[in-house]
Amino acid sequence: MSVTLDLSRMAPSMSKEGGDAPKALINLSGLTRAQLLVALTESGVAEHGKAKMRATQIFRWMHHRGVTDFALMTDVAKETRARLAERFTVSRPEVVERQVSKDGTRKWLIRMAPGIEVETVYIPSVGRAGALCVSSQVGCTLNCSFCHTGTQALVRNLTAAEIVAQVQIAKDDLAEWPSDKEDRLLSNIVFMGMGEPLYNLGHVADAIEIISDNEGIGISRRRITVSTSGVVPQLEALGDKTQAMLAISLHATNDALRDVLVPLNKKYPLEDLMAGVRAYPGLSNARRVTFEYVMLKGVNDSPDEARALVKLIKGIPAKINLIPFNPWPGTDYVCSDWAAIEAFGAILNKAGYSSPIRTPRGRDILAACGQLKSESEKVRASAMRKLSMAAMAGVLDDDDEAAA
C-alpha cells in the first residue's frame, strides 16, 4: 500500500510582516509510521536505504519513550538529529491548567495554539486501569441541549498530532513512559470529549492508528471507543478505517424528543441511525455497540421510555450506559432520581441488556460527562472586554484633554 503525504497541508504558513511566510514545523507525533516514513524520505532527512529503520526508531522514541526533544534520541545519528530539528518538532502543546478531583479524576486544559484550548479528562477505575476522554474538535456544531460543550461554537478540528498530544500529556502526568503493555494506568481511550469525531474522521483515524501501534503506545483498538451523535454516512468508514468500538449518543427513543436533545437527529433520524448501527463493520456479541443514555428527570426517564428503548435496539448486540445528568452553569435540566434510574435499568436488564449506571466522576472540577468546555470563549470575551475598556479610556483621555 502506497502512502502520500502533503507536508505543506500539514504545516500551515505563519504570517510574517515584510517577507515570505515561514513554514511552521511539522509535529511528527501526528504521523502514522507509514506517514513518518514518507516525511523522512521526501524531506531528505533519513540516510539512503535507512528511512524505514529511522521511521521506526523515531516513532518508538516519541510514543514508547515519550521524548520531546530530538537530542534525546541517542540511537539516531547526531547529524540526522540536527536535520530533524531544522524541519520537524516532537514538542507538546502547553498545559494551561491541571485539576484533580477528590475522586482522583484529572482534567487538563491544553492550549494547542493561541486561543485554541481543549479539555481532556482521565477517569481512574477501581483497579489500576483508567480511561482517557479525548477531544476531537475545539467546540462543537451539534448543539445538544443537555451538553455544556454544545454551548461553545466550533472553532476548528484538531489535527492528529493534537489528538495524540492529549494521550501523551496524560502519560506524562501519570508517569507512564515507557509505554508498558501490562499493568498500565491508562488502559482505554474514549473519544467522548469536545466535538463530533465523525466530522473529523481523517485525523481521528490517524490518531487511532498511532495510539494503537504496538511500536509505541500500543493500546488495543478494542480498548478505543469512538462516540458519535449519529453521523450516519460516516459510520461504515469509521469501522473500516479504525476498527474501533462504537458508541452512540442516543438519549431518546423517538424522533420528536431526540430532535430537541440531539438536533442532528433532524438530519439523520432514528430509523436511519439504527440501520447504520446494524451495518457497522465487525459488530458482534464480542464487539457490541454502546448506547449512551443521559438520564433527565421528567424528560426521558419513564418506564415507558425504557420499554421503547428495548424495542428500538432489538436485535443489536449492545449494552446501554445510563448516565446520571451532570449539571453545568445555566442548564435547565435536572438529573433523574436515583430510584428512577435503577427502575429504568431494571427493565433493560430484564430484557437481556447490560445497563450499568455510570458513576459520576469529576463533577467538582466540571470534568464529568457533558460538562467539558474550553476556556477559549472566556479568554476571547475577556480580551474583547479589555479592548473595549482601553478604547473607552482613550476616549475619556481625549475628552479630558479637550476640556483642558
Curated annotation (Swiss-Prot):
CDD domains the UniProt entry points to: Radical_SAM
Major subcellular location class: cytoplasm
GO molecular function: 4 iron, 4 sulfur cluster binding; metal ion binding; rRNA (adenine(2503)-C2-)-methyltransferase activity; rRNA binding; tRNA (adenine(37)-C2)-methyltransferase activity; tRNA binding
Occurrences of domain Radical SAM core (ranges): 126-358
Cofactor: binding comment: Binds 1 [4Fe-4S] cluster. The cluster is coordinated with 3 cysteines and an exchangeable S-adenosyl-L-methionine.
Residues annotated to bind [4Fe-4S] cluster: 140, 144, 147
Keyword check for Hydrolase: no
Keywords for this protein: 4Fe-4S, Cytoplasm, Disulfide bond, Iron, Iron-sulfur, Metal-binding, Methyltransferase, rRNA processing, S-adenosyl-L-methionine, Transferase, tRNA processing
Cofactor(s) needed by this chain: [4Fe-4S] cluster
Active site: 119, 369
Subcellular location: Cytoplasm
EC number(s) stated in the UniProt entry for this protein: 2.1.1.192
Disulfide cysteine pairs (residue numbers): 133-369
Keyword Methyltransferase carried by entry: yes
Sites where the protein binds S-adenosyl-L-methionine: 195-196, 227, 249-251, 326
Enzyme class, broadest EC rank: transferase
Catalytic function, reaction form: adenosine(2503) in 23S rRNA + 2 reduced [2Fe-2S]-[ferredoxin] + 2 S-adenosyl-L-methionine = 2-methyladenosine(2503) in 23S rRNA + 5'-deoxyadenosine + L-methionine + 2 oxidized [2Fe-2S]-[ferredoxin] + S-adenosyl-L-homocysteine; adenosine(37) in tRNA + 2 reduced [2Fe-2S]-[ferredoxin] + 2 S-adenosyl-L-methionine = 2-methyladenosine(37) in tRNA + 5'-deoxyadenosine + L-methionine + 2 oxidized [2Fe-2S]-[ferredoxin] + S-adenosyl-L-homocysteine
Entry GO CC: cytoplasm
Additional note from the record: Reaction proceeds by a ping-pong mechanism involving intermediate methylation of a conserved cysteine residue.
Protein task: Specifically methylates position 2 of adenine 2503 in 23S rRNA and position 2 of adenine 37 in tRNAs. m2A2503 modification seems to play a crucial role in the proofreading step occurring at the peptidyl transferase center and thus would serve to optimize ribosomal fidelity.
Xref: NCBIfam families: rRNA_mod_RlmN (TIGR00048)
Family: Belongs to the radical SAM superfamily. RlmN family.
Name of this chain's protein: Dual-specificity RNA methyltransferase RlmN
Source species: Caulobacter sp. (strain K31)
Gene: rlmN
